Amino acid sequence: MMCLAFQSFHFIKKHLGNRKGYLSLPFVWLGFEHVHSNWEFSHPWLSFGNVFSVRTNWIQWYEYTGVSGGTLWIIIVNLFLFLLLKRWMNNEETKKIRILSGIAIAIPILVSILVKRSFEHSIEQEKRNFEVVLVQPNIDPYNEKFTGGPHAQTNKFIQLANSKITPNTKLVIFPETALSFSFFENEFHRLSIYPKYINAVQRWGADVLIGASTMKRFKNKRSKASRENPDGTFTEYYNSSLLIKKNLKNKYIHKSKLVVGVEKIPYSDYFPFLEDIAIDNGGAVGSLGEEDTVKIFKTSNGAIAPIVCYESIYPEFVAEQCRKGAELLCVITNDGWWGDTPGYKQHFSFARLRAIENRRWLVRSANTGKSGVISPTGEVISESKWWEEDVLLANTQLLSEKTIFSTYGDFLGRSAAFVWMLIFVYSISKKILPSRR
């Protein structure tokens, strides 16, 4: 896909000239990143703007532009540096390009400082404290996740939470697929572990957000994820967020952004045989069911956005949750599948960008790490270590003010994709029309 984007840039430059070609590059690449984030093979992990997740003081203006703004900054600076190097190698005047390069680097950083100060001043007027307990049980997904007994694991979860619960705790969060065995959603109350969670909720006076592997049965085939049963009914499996509230019906939200090749087989609607090559991740094999629309939970004390693992790398998905009223971002994940690689570190770091884009506190419960608490300015307030059992007490705030990015989403990416198509069509016309003369 990246090669196709550069091939498009090369084609435009060839037929419109160097000047227009280089001017088109930001539109080409931004448009590519936007398109790549919105098809069935989407993988926005590699978007250029993600690199600033470790330099959050430089990109506080992501609350306006999102990651696409960072991508645009990188492309513009690199274009200036390329032109500077080209002129220097040709012994041409470089003073103007050097000045422009310096301005392109400095202005966004200065703007970031001003934006951060402005936000920190405004947040003082909105203080609704919301205490959260984050549990990191550290269950080895390769050896314990699907073999440990549900009662033993439930007891462990509750004991860990007990160590940090206070009378002010509003929410307790357990990681993705903490309930790793599949069960029908309308039968959760019949499970032998159910009383343990209900008793804990009543004792704590706090709601529980927990990851679960769930199922639903349908009379008719609902989607490509529906599996036919011997009796002619259909079952769908889900990677779900489950909200357990005192004396109220349990609520479920299914993961919407599924991992390609593990939870979702791209375009299997058209090529059903592809379902047979799905990777076995220890649970249901093949495409999982997913939500039709973006949803949030209403807890007893405020609105939260349940973000399951891979969903946290999708800026527009999280922005839509905030548009729907989410006041706190809650990431649940099981990063143990990565092993001790840069993957889990990057995944944690990207969450800092979601906090800045939407100006929300973000709390993260990861099975094996890293769990953590991130402020609306992307600052890591506290974090756990990798592959260690831990519990964090998070003193956060519920925030409701919407940012430009929360309101309009990736407007830069959408606009760039549109302009890219126009430029590309125009360059095709320049190639074709001369041949007809």
Question: Where are the model-predicted features located?
Answer:
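Class I S-adenosylmethionine
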Residues: P108-V111, T147-G148, C330
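CN hydrolase (nitrilase-like) catalytic-core segments centered on the catalytic cysteine
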Residues: P26, L171, A178-L179, E187-K216, ...
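A generic secondary-structure signal
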Residues: F11, R87, Q159-S163, E320
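Membrane-embedded alpha-helical bundles of multi-pass enzymes
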Residues: M1-F119, G339-D340, A351-R354, A366-I374, ...
